[in-house]
Curated annotation (Swiss-Prot):
Residue positions binding a divalent metal cation: D31, E32, D124
Main location: cytoplasm
Provenance organism: Magnetococcus marinus (strain ATCC BAA-1437 / JCM 17883 / MC-1)
Catalytic activity: Endonucleolytic cleavage to 5'-phosphomonoester
Record-listed E.C. numbers: 3.1.26.4
Ranges for domain RNase H type-2: 25-213
Protein's name in the database: Ribonuclease HII
Cellular component GO terms, alphabetical: cytoplasm; ribonuclease H2 complex
Family, similarity comment: Belongs to the RNase HII family.
Amino acid sequence: MRHKAHPGPDLELECALLRSNRAIKTLCGVDEAGRGPLCGPVVAAAVVLDLDNLPVGLNDSKQLSAKKREQLFEQIYVTSQVGVGEASVAEIDALNILHASMLAMVRAVTALQGRLVVDHALIDGNRVPATLPVPGQAVVKGDAKSLSIAAASIIAKVTRDRIMAELDRDYPHYGWAKSQGYPTQAHLQALALHGVTPHHRRSFKPVKQLLPH
């Protein structure tokens, strides 16, 4: 018997948690954007959805066009509670990208807690940050399973894309508004031609090998 492909994120995880644990009244989804780029911060978001007022068309950010992500970004901010956190390039280089991503997630949940009490977090990926201020559960490929995580993925992605578009204005040779800092051929060529900027991650190999020894 062939298994059907997962139809996309839904509220099964959220509803199961709310049913099984009466101590959980409010839960958030958490995701990050920007682990792979050669430059710019890593950004995380934590989102508590209003289960009775979900944004129409909510899906994993990777399945959406840039225009649809922008539309949903605005809808999520109107209908939901949102916290955003980031880790800087300096923190990425000092900690490594994994630990910097965990730090950004902790900051996002902490920011969200400034708005309301959060009892539980659904974290995209295979680990829960050690210093997360609330109990958490890791969900592998969570942005394709949980609508709360999918919403967080959209907030994190659009927030970071906007940051890279701003940086692109100061450093137009690198094409960051288009590539978001990922190691595209055009970005690598510009890096070799124009050099390393203060926004590049010096611990990442394509950048590190261009630094003076």
